[in-house]
Amino acid sequence: HAWWVRTQKALPARIPLPETLCFEDICERLRAAAVEDTCRTYTENSFFCRSTYRFDGRFLLVRMENFQKADFDAVKKRVNHAVNREFHLPQRYAAGELAYKMRFYILYTEAANDELMRHISRNAETLLRRAEGVMTFVLCGDSLIVPPLYGDADTAAVRRYAGAIRMMRDLLRHPRAH
């Protein structure tokens, strides 16, 4: 049945949040959980911080009215380049640290279009198996949209996936510091 699982197209899941958050509210909640002096606004519609809440994570929040993958990739590239230059973050980690290293991309939008839903529905299992796992979330209205996990996900990827969803849900539900 492994071929069947790999060929199925899974849909992102919507997790309801207790309230609708604006871009600034999300920035504040990330800032409350951030490592001191790591919060940056590199563009008008992006916010970066590092946090050690549940993961040693890099967070990039991007506001997009109408998702276009090329625009999102350009923002990611520009911000990641600036972050690497400013913070001199290592590209290699000790084996014991890898399970906790993550990059989180959070897209904030008023309405999720088809291109956005296709984008977050691709490759979650592959991105979570990287040394520094990568996960993309979407915040749309009062919902957290999470990518589907299907295919050849190993136990470590499933743990990262479940832990990342719990972490995001907690960060967005509670405005206090973690």
Task: Walk through the language-model features, giving the residues of each.
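N-terminal, charge-rich interaction modules
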Residues: 3-64
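Short, flexible helical or helix-coil boundary motifs
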Residues: 11, 33-37, 86, 165, ...
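Compositionally biased amphipathic helical and low-complexity segments enriched in hydrophobic
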Residues: 12, 18, 22, 31, ...
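General structural signal for secondary-structure boundaries
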Residues: 22, 68-71, 159
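Exposed alpha-helical structural elements
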Residues: 25, 74, 115, 160-163, ...
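Ordered hydrophobic segments in well-structured contexts
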Residues: 46-65, 102-108, 133-148
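Catalytic cores of nucleic-acid endonucleases
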Residues: 66-128, 132-136
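Charged, structured surface patches that assemble and position nucleic-acid processing machinery
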Residues: 120-178
